């Protein structure tokens, strides 16, 4: 029987091998004949078709190549859902429901017009045609047949039923007695046309027309004779005479002009058009019109008549508005960093560059138009709430309309000097004004909801608009009369509209196309253009719609802007920083002349910020400045008195505290500089007093503020005993200074900001506590009297004025170098970009990118030298200004002060003296001390007094050093447990040499033995403190002496480290890991990470994209490299052509499918894995993204109307999506109409509420009179409202503030320490804190994924260069459980069908296979002992613990009947075992999660009321258990005891198949086979993890040592007879039944007997079958060799094995414990073997199923094409096949 089984298997080897080739993808070979034009697709059969016909589900090519496999229609068909107001075509297209069965084929497959479709129609409120079709009532009797048989035009002068008022004789109508209205022609014709006979009767003969006196015609009726008129005439009130009808009054009777003639009319056309043969339609002369439209990534055009497409611009970031005139096309582009630009490009010149003409002052341009007379560009800026205009080169720009709310579209009428725009804000309307911005008035404001776009029909003088909310197109005359609806019901999701001839054209996001219809009737609707990307703006260009008129601006009468006005003249305009002179033609400065100076290394850039337009940038190079003037810049300060700047640079020396600082004055006008003083000491921060010509410096060592007078070079000082001044800013004209203090030099607490007098006197005023720093750049704006403070680490900018202190901006990345110009605050962030915001009106989120400083590095050499911690990236911005400042007494001969003149608030100024001197009686002159106070000591020379505490301080303060005599040692009287400082002070002895200064003279840290720092630590130079090396050169001083930020460019990193540009050393494993560890991202730079580096592991193939894969994955028919390179040059009987995608194409994930880039993020799934629609942004910031990818205004969310079409805007309306208008609460201020505003916009002098309710009431008195707030105070119309600074919240009394414990908000990824007003995050030993200071990064090698696919088990790294290593081939066998052991670098997996558990050591390739569990499913590994906890899903259903090396298992838990276990997990640290039990109740699953210790004792149910718990994982850092629930599609978490249970993730469509935790991010594999990760701390965001579609299926695990920290194994100290497992405190011995026994004890013999019986049975079977086995093996080998040799010769050089199903080695196995008889035969003639060289497999079965399995397999049918069958034979029969391709 066994021999038959072997022959049966062998006979199918070749068919299986051949069938495996069928997995290879076959590409069609292109048979191109001639090249098609742009916009056309070339069929393989040679013909050309429009590109939009490709992949539309209809064969247009003869050979059908336009619908071939590249279209990838595949599974998306069954998932498309159309909205309720749509009809779903058979080809899955969605069309408006009104277009179903309307006698027009709107579906591309014509499925909307199938036979019998009229049976499904409901013609309510419509006209019913004879055949059952429906048409609009407006189309009845309009002179055109709309019903198939034309019955909508029958009896048009005799409606079926009517009233007496509408059934009139003058209209050739007759009213029957039954109210039926019939034609006069059929009255008295001897036929009953009325149906009641009332149209016939005696009266038809009794009355005579001769006596009627009719002017024209007469008709007999039963009621008497009636007069009628000829066509074209109308019967008058006398019912006898006729007058001519003016047909021209009928709407739409002519395309353009109409001329009335007696009895008729004639249509005429304007000069630029001609009348077509229908005598009604006007056709434009001078060639075809061009329809231009934007599609996010490109600007496209189409010739309207020929429908030929062409491209104008491609590879754009986000094009929105578009316009075209003459030789240029213009568009607005939304840049990646969020700011808008206006770009122009020459038309019909594909190679012409894109010229950015407007770069500054734009936010969101949705509408743009060009005045073809002046060439000016007009635009609507939705986010800046304005209408603006620029010259066509962007040189001059200005704002015309400032107070509009949400402008979206703009249309120009140059012939009348007018412009129109739509506004969909709080009060939707359409407005009109002159093109110079004057005479603004509301044009339409009734029945408008979302007017999205406006356009003008110039010949007919009508304005058209499209309303995206009411889904309607309307029009009105330009005089405001005759408003009409053109089209409704069919409009879906319009964006922009234009008009030309008798057609309307609009872009529609629902169909991703351009639609068109008749502009009068709405008829002839169709989709003109279909596109992959959403179309944005549309624009029509033709000379006929842009008639020339005299240009009044032709002679350049204006110095800047010249605009048309409504008086057929012109108006001059100026940029925002200028105003018109009295001559109304020239411009003058309206503000003080000021601009910015950007300094980056040697580059000095004059940056002219004019708020709107194109900034003027000039680069200066100062050759006459010495080289060292550019080194180590530590501060740049503006001097508004002279218009110059003060430059400070550090001259480094060793030791650091002996460094000096040079102060230079730079003249930006003459580009000259001079050194004014050298400070021979180190200072922390510097500020300049332009009134007294003083430099204020903070000295952290002496805990003082030192003032240096630049006139006399003399110095005075203010000392602070208990705190250290660090940061300083001055307001000289107000005699104020702002100083940030820290508790002490070595304190880790936050900074406290105070307001003080500049003379150091008087009481201090607290401004803010709890500032984090570690840097605190400040700037005081003298105009607004506002202090701006940047808290670097949290990314806040605060503003402080007399009115309030508030957060101006948040969420910034290390904002530094603050300055102000006008109403704008400027700063630089770590991305090397200059940002600005209007500090008077800005919201907390508003900022604008002004200038990209990184572009300056393109042609620059880097600045040599050290970058100090004060100068993060050697970039500064200051405001150059020269103001008329009133003269001050200090400016007159230094106030007659002999040394220092200090501005003072009360007495104008005071004179100050250096230490050791005092003012004389004249209060001007400083003299030496003659008498010393009791707290002073008088030196014997020069009459100098010193402080008494300066005695014996180790510093010679007296000229002769008498204060430091040998007697100093005996002066002190310190206790035995104290240390005496040199100055005589006593401190605790344990504070001596603790790396912190406790003696005021710092003598406690002298002559100390240096502490020994670890190899991964850095020792501070002066304080000798040890800090982690990772904190070196991170721009945050951690050493008190700042030495960790010193000489960073000279730092040498070890061979295992990578050096960042700023000198920071990071582990090499952090390089190219997709995580920026260097502050500037240098460790992830493309030139490093995409270089041609060989794969680090042997037997790996290097893909061209940098990825590495196992050699065994080559030529397997699967695209493992993701670029197809692993499937090139493969020997096969089928030639496969893999295409290399071009730069303008997108490759679908894991395939060789190349798609045009414009299908990326087009709202439709074009790739098999839908990866082209991942990480996309479809909607603008003020819009809501529907689930169906539609975009609607946020105002429509939760307004009880289904605006999305899929009702997603009305979901979760009791939660976070509630519409703020519907809500009763606002976070801050609520306007009377319901609008919410931040307090910063309330009572600020600007009407921000639509009704102005934010500027009324008590705005003038709030917070100024009886201010009861103890924190911040906000002005409101209702009075003062108290608030708190960041880090605090209002207390219960709503007046005072209390600290927020941010740690309770789970803001840190691991551990958190709350501080007053702030918090600090820190990490466990196996992690380091990231640059964001909140998340922790695991130390060690890169994290690796262990994944299960259909074919194998793989190991993958997820970084810029992923490595995919095939660990073990599965050949179709399903893996039921998976886990890893990072300590031993092993992978474990189970298979419940064949009862196997395998362990693979990744390092040694050693494989252990055991068959000691009948049906093993879920498993978990205890990484300390190596034990495996597994669920045995046999009839007993238990959880066992197994030692694979010993081949032993013990039963720990018995599961209840009808319960199943789907997940098991262990916590080796806390010694817990968790599992989920599942049962089916009432047709739905229910689950509970149970917990025991690792011996199976102390069971507790920690969670119940669950659905189907499939996966579990543990966060060992935070001791949290996570589980996924398939039924409820959620992921939940709880503590180990079940407390604090909560839902952490809700999945909408899919459920999580497998979950894991790494670095406090939850990784989950969803049922659509996509791997994602979600942060479980802070703002919990999720992202897709791209590891390739072919690299995982159902199961994965994460391998990293930080997840399984090594611990000593307590079982090593135990001597167990059977097995050792972990227990709470240590370990314990157990027997096979799970019972615990003492160490060195023996298990109960009864327990072992069961096991022995099993062994004996196996041995008996083995003995009986031994002889037969040898015979069978010999025969089998002979037959198999012949079989293989035959097929090998048959296919020699013809193909290469491409499947994992090919045979490489045969293991003969007779199941037994006795391995001595095992025979292994290797067949080297095969292409590959299962086990790699050095790889070993050990089989340890407990039962012998061989004979029974062989008999069963002999009866099986041929299922060889399935890999699973091979594994069945491998496990259950006498032989099995193992393959490991190379």
Swiss-Prot record:
Main location class: membrane
Domain LDL-receptor class A: 35-72, 81-118, 122-157, 166-205, 931-969, 973-1009, 1012-1049, 1052-1090, 1094-1131, 1140-1177, 1178-1214, 1225-1260
Signal peptide residue numbers: 1-18
Residue stretches of each LDL-receptor class B repeat: 327-374, 375-416, 417-460, 461-501, 502-544, 1385-1425, 1471-1518, 1519-1561
Domain EGF-like positions: 208-243, 244-283, 552-588, 889-927, 1262-1298
Tissue: Expressed in ovaries of reproductive females.
Pfam families: cEGF, EGF_CA, FXa_inhibition, Ldl_recept_a, Ldl_recept_b
Membrane-spanning parts: 1664-1684
Residues bearing carbohydrate: 122, 159, 208, 239, 702, 859, 896, 923, 1133, 1140, 1175, 1626, 1640, 1656
Subcellular location: Membrane
InterPro entries per UniProt: 6-blade_b-propeller_TolB-like (IPR011042), cEGF (IPR026823), EGF-like_Ca-bd_dom (IPR001881), EGF-like_dom (IPR000742), EGF_Ca-bd_CS (IPR018097), Growth_fac_rcpt_cys_sf (IPR009030), LDL_receptor-like_sf (IPR036055), LDLR-related (IPR051221)
Stretches in topological domain Cytoplasmic: 1685-1782
Cystine residue pairs: 36-48, 43-61, 55-71, 82-94, 89-107, 101-117, 123-134, 129-147, 141-156, 167-181, 176-194, 188-204, 248-258, 254-267, 269-282, 932-945, 939-958, 952-968, 974-986, 981-999, 993-1008, 1013-1026, 1020-1039, 1033-1048, 1053-1065, 1060-1078, 1072-1089, 1095-1108, 1103-1121, 1115-1130, 1141-1154, 1148-1167, 1161-1176, 1179-1191, 1186-1204, 1198-1213, 1226-1236, 1231-1249, 1243-1259
Keyword annotations of the record: Calcium, Disulfide bond, EGF-like domain, Endocytosis, Glycoprotein, Membrane, Receptor, Repeat, Signal, Transmembrane, Transmembrane helix
UniProt topology in membrane: Single-pass membrane protein
Gene Ontology CC annotations of this record: apical plasma membrane; receptor complex
A GO biological-process term: receptor-mediated endocytosis
Functional note: Involved in uptake of vitellogenin by endocytosis. Expression is regulated by the juvenile hormone analog, methoprene (in vitro).
Name by which UniProt lists this protein: Vitellogenin receptor
Species per Swiss-Prot/TrEMBL record: Solenopsis invicta (Red imported fire ant)
């Amino acid at each position: 029987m066994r021999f038959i089984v072997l022959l049966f298997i062998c006979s199918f080897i070749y068919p299986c091998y051949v069938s495996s080739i069928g997995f290879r993808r076959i590409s069609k070979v292109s048979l191109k004949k001639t090249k098609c034009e742009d916009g056309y697709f070339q069929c393989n059969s040679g013909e050309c078709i429009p590109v939009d016909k490709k992949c539309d589900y209809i064969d247009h090519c003869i050979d059908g190549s336009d619908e071939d496999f590249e279209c990838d229609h595949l599974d998306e068909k069954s998932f498309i859902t159309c909205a309720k107001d749509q009809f779903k075509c058979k080809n899955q297209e969605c069309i408006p429901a009104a277009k179903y069965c309307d006698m027009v084929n709107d579906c591309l497959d014509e499925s909307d017009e199938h036979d019998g479709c009229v049976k499904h129609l409901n013609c309510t409120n419509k006209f019913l045609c004879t055949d059952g079709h429906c048409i609009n009532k407006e189309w009845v009797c309009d002179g055109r047949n709309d019903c198939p048989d034309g019955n909508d035009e029958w009896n048009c002068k005799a409606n079926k039923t009517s009233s007496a008022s509408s059934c009139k004789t003058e209209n050739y109508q007759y009213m029957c007695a039954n109210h039926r209205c019939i034609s006069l022609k059929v009255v008295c014709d001897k036929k009953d046309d009325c149906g009641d006979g009332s149209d016939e009767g005696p009266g038809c003969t009794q009355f005579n027309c001769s006596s009627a006196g009719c002017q024209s015609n007469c008709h007999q009726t039963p009621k008497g004779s009636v007069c009628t008129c000829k066509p074209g005439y109308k019967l008058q009130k006398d019912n006898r005479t006729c007058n001519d009808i003016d047909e021209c009054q009928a709407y739409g009777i002519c395309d353009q002009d109409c001329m009335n003639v007696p009895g008729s009319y004639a249509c005429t056309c304007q000069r630029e058009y001609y009348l077509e043969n229908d005598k009604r339609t006007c056709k434009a002369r001078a060639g075809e019109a061009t329809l231009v439209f934007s599609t996010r990534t490109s600007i496209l055009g189409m010739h309207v008549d020929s429908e030929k497409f062409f491209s104008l611009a491609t590879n754009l970031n986000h094009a929105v508005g578009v316009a075209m005139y003459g030789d240029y096309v213009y568009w607005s582009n939304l840049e990646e960093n969020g700011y808008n630009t206006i770009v122009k490009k020459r038309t019909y010149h594909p190679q012409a560059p894109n010229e950015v003409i407007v770069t500054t002052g734009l936010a969101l341009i949705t509408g743009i138009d060009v005045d073809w007379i002046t060439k000016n560009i007009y635009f609507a800026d939705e986010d800046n709430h304005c209408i603006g205009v620029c010259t066509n080169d962007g040189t001059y720009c200005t704002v015309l309309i400032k107070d509009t709310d949400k402008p979206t579209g703009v249309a120009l009428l140059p012939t009348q000097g007018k412009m129109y725009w739509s506004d969909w804000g709080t009060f939707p309307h359409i407005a009109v004004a002159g093109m110079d911005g004057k005479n603004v008035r509301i044009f339409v404001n009734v029945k408008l909801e979302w007017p999205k776009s406006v356009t003008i029909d110039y010949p007919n003088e009508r304005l058209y608009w499209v309303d995206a909310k009411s889904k309607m197109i309307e029009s009105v005359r330009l005089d405001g009369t005759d408003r009409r609806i053109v089209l409704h019901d069919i409009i879906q999701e319009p964006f922009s509209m234009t008009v030309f001839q008798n057609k309307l054209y609009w872009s529609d996001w629902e169909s991703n196309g351009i639609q068109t219809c008749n502009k009068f009737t709405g008829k002839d609707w169709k989709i003109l253009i279909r596109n992959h990307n959403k179309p944005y703006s549309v624009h029509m260009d033709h000379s006929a719609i842009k008639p020339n008129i005299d240009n009044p601006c032709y002679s350049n009468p204006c110095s800047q802007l010249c605009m048309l006005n409504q008086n057929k003249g012109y108006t001059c305009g100026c940029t925002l920083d200028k105003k018109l002179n009295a001559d109304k033609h020239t411009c003058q400065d309206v503000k003080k002349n000021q601009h910015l100076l950007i300094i980056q290394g040697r580059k000095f850039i004059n940056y002219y910020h004019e708020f709107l337009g194109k900034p003027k940038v000039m680069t200066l190079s100062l050759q006459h400045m010495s080289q060292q003037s550019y080194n180590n810049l530590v501060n740049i300060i503006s001097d508004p008195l002279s218009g110059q700047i003060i430059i400070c640079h550090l001259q480094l020396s060793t030791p650091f505290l002996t460094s000096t600082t040079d102060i230079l004055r730079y003249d930006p006008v003459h580009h000259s500089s001079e050194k004014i003083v050298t400070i021979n000491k180190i200072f922390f921060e510097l500020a300049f007093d332009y009134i007294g010509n003083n430099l204020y410096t903070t000295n952290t060592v002496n805990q003082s503020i030192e003032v240096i007078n630049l006139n006399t070079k003399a110095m005075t000082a203010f000392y602070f005993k208990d705190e250290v001044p660090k940061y300083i800013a001055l307001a000289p004209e107000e005699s104020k200074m702002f100083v940030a203090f820290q508790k002490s030099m070595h304190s880790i607490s936050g900074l406290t900001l105070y307001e003080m007098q500049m003379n150091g006197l008087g009481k201090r005023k607290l401004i803010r506590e709890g500032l984090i720093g570690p840097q605190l750049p400040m700037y005081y704006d003298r105009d607004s009297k506002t202090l701006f403070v940047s808290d670097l680490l949290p990314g806040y900018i605060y503003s402080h004025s007399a009115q309030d202190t508030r957060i101006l901006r948040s969420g910034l990345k290390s904002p530094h170098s603050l300055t102000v110009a006008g109403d704008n605050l400027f700063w630089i962030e770590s991305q090397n970009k200059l940002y600005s915001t209007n500090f008077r009106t800005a919201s907390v989120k508003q900022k604008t990118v002004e200038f990209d400083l990184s572009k300056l590095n393109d042609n620059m050499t880097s600045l040599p030298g050290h970058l100090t911690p004060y100068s993060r990236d050697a970039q500064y911005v200051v405001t150059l200004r020269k103001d008329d400042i009133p003269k001050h007494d200090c400016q007159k001969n230094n106030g007659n002060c002999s040394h220092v003149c200090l501005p003072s608030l009360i007495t104008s100024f005071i004179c100050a003296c250096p230490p050791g001197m005092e003012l004389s009686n004249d209060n001007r002159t400083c003299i030496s001390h003659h008498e010393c106070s009791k707290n002073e000591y008088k030196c014997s020379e020069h009459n100098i007094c010193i402080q008494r505490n300066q005695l014996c301080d180790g510093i010679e303060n007296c000229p002769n050093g008498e204060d430091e005599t040998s007697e100093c040692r005996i002066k002190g009287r310190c206790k035995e447990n104290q240390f005496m400082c040199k100055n005589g002070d006593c401190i605790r002895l344990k504070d001596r040499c603790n790396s912190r200064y406790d003696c005021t003279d710092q003598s406690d840290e002298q002559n100390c033995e240096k502490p020994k720092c670890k190899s991964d630590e850095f020792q501070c130079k002066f304080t000798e403190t040890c800090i982690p090396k990772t904190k070196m050169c991170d721009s945050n001083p951690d050493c008190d002496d700042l030495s960790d930020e010193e000489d960073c460019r000279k730092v040498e990193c070890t061979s295992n480290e990578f050096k960042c540009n700023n000198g920071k050393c990071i582990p090499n494993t952090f390089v190219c890991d997709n995580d920026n560890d260097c502050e500037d991202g240098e460790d992830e730079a493309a030139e490093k990470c995409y270089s041609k580096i060989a794969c680090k592991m042997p037997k790996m193939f290097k893909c061209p994209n940098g990825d590495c894969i196992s050699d065994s994955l080559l030529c397997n028919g699967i695209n493992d490299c993701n670029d197809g390179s692993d499937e090139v040059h493969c020997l096969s009987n089928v030639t496969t052509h893999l295409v290399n995608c071009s730069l303008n194409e997108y490759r679908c994930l894991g395939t060789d499918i190349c798609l045009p880039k414009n299908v990326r993020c087009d709202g439709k799934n074009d790739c098999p894995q839908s990866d082209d629609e991942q990480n996309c942004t479809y909607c603008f910031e003020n819009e809501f993204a529907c689930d169906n990818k539609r975009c609607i205004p946020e105002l429509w969310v939760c307004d009880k109307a289904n605006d999305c079409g899929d009702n997603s805007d009305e979901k979760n309306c009791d939660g976070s999506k509630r519409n703020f208008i519907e809500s009763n609460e606002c976070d801050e201020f609520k306007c009377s109409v319901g609008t919410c505003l931040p307090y910063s916009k309330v009572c600020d002098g600007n009407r921000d509420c639509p009704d102005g309710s934010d500027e009324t009431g008590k705005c003038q008195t709030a917070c100024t009179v009886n201010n009861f707030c103890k924190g911040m105070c906000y002005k409101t119309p209702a009075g003062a409202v108290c608030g708190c600074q960041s880090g605090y919240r209002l207390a219960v009394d709503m007046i005072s503030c209390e600290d927020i414990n941010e740690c309770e908000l789970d803001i840190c990824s691991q551990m958190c320490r709350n501080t007053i007003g702030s918090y600090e995050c820190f990490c466990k030993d196996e992690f380091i804190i990231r640059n964001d200071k909140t998340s922790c990064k695991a130390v060690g090698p890169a994290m690796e994924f262990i994944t299960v696919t259909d074919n194998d088990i793989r190991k993958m790294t997820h970084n810029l260069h992923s490595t995919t290593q095939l660990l073990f081939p599965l050949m179709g066998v399903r893996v039921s459980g998976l886990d890893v052991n990072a300590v031993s670098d092993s992978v474990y997996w189970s298979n419940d069908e064949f009862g196997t558990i395998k362990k693979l050591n990744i390092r040694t390739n050693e494989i252990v296979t055991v068959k000691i569990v009948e049906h093993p499913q879920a498993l978990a590994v205890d990484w300390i002992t190596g034990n495996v906890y597994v669920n045995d899903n046999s009839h007993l259903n238990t959880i066992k613990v197994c030692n694979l090396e010993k081949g032993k298992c013990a039963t720990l838990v018995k599961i209840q009947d009808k319960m199943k276990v789907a997940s098991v997990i262990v916590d080796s640290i806390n010694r817990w075992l968790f599992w989920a039990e599942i049962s089916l109740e009432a047709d739905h699953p229910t689950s509970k999660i149970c917990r025991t210790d690792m011996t199976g004792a102390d069971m507790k149910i920690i969670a119940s009321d669950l659905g189907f718990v499939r996966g579990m994982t543990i966060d060992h850092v935070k001791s949290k258990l996570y589980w996924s629930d398939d039924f409820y599609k959620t992921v939940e978490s709880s503590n180990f005891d079940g407390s604090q249970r909560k839902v952490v993730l809700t999945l909408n469509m899919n459920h999580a198949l497998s979950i894991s935790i790494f670095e406090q991010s939850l990784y989950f594999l969803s049922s659509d086979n996509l791997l994602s990760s979600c942060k479980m701390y802070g703002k919990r965001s999720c992202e897709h993890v791209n590891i390739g579609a072919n690299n995982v299926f159902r199961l994965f695990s994460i391998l990293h040592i930080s997840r399984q920290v090594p611990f000593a194994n307590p079982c090593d100290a135990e001597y167990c007879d059977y097995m050792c497992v972990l227990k709470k405190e240590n370990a314990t011995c157990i027997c096979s039944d799970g019972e615990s026994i003492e160490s060195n004890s023996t298990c109960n013999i009864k327990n072992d007997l069961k096991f022995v019986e099993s062994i004996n049975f196996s041995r008996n079977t083995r003995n009986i079958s031994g002889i037969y086995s040898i015979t069978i093996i010999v025969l089998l080998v002979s037959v198999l060799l012949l079989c293989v040799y035959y097929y090998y010769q048959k296919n020699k050089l013809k193909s290469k094995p491409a499947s994992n199903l090919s045979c490489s080695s045969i293991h003969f196995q007779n199941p037994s414990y006795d391995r001595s008889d095992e025979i292994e035969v290797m067949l080297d003639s095969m292409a590959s073997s299962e086990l790699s060289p050095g790889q070993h497999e050990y089989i340890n079965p407990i039962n012998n199923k061989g004979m029974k399995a062989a008999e069963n397999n002999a009866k099986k049918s041929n299922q060889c094409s399935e890999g699973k069958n091979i594994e069945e034979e491998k496990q259950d029969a006498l032989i099995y096949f193992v393959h490991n391709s190379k």
